[in-house]
Amino acid sequence: MNYELTKDFINVHLNDDVNKLALSKFPDDIDKQFVIRQIQARQLLKKKLPSWSENDELLFPKRLSLEQCSSELTAKYKRTISQNDAKTQSRDASMAPAIKHIDTSLHRILVDLTGGMGVDTSFLSDNFDETIYVESQAELCELAEHNFKVLKKNIKVVNAKAEDFLAQCGEVDCIYLDPARRDEYGRKMVSLHDCSPDVAE
């Protein structure tokens, strides 16, 4: 696939009706399925995640992940909450410098156990010195790794189940998770035990 040609094609047809576009003939070196998915994603995210939708270097996953990801407004709000927590930790450390177990250097580590599209991870990472994105789906990990580089975010991507990662994880400052509340068929889950990962365990 010719990436530059594909990107130009997407930008030209960004506002097209994707159903009609899917019936049209595509150049041989452009992946029709990939292009349709990217155009659909940008149209869906135009209001929900404007800064990502407008960045033509970013790549997007299947529709279910788009529907489940946080909006830009929500992700920024979560970032504000974690920023306030950082200020509290900094204040507590400065008030008790003689207590040896308090690390006044405050190298803060965040682990997002439900990485998904990486929206929350990306915004939350601004308040941490080290950020680890954990996701069980390999395709989402590949897309997240690409997008984090585009966004100039220094985030480590780990392809693993949340439970497996936690079993070998060292000490961190913040663990974030937003479990999937829909199954692979898009059906809404009600019980916490049905969510992935099972946060009730």
Language-model segments: which ranges?
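SAM-dependent transferase fold signal centered on methyltransferase-like domains
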Residues: 1-201
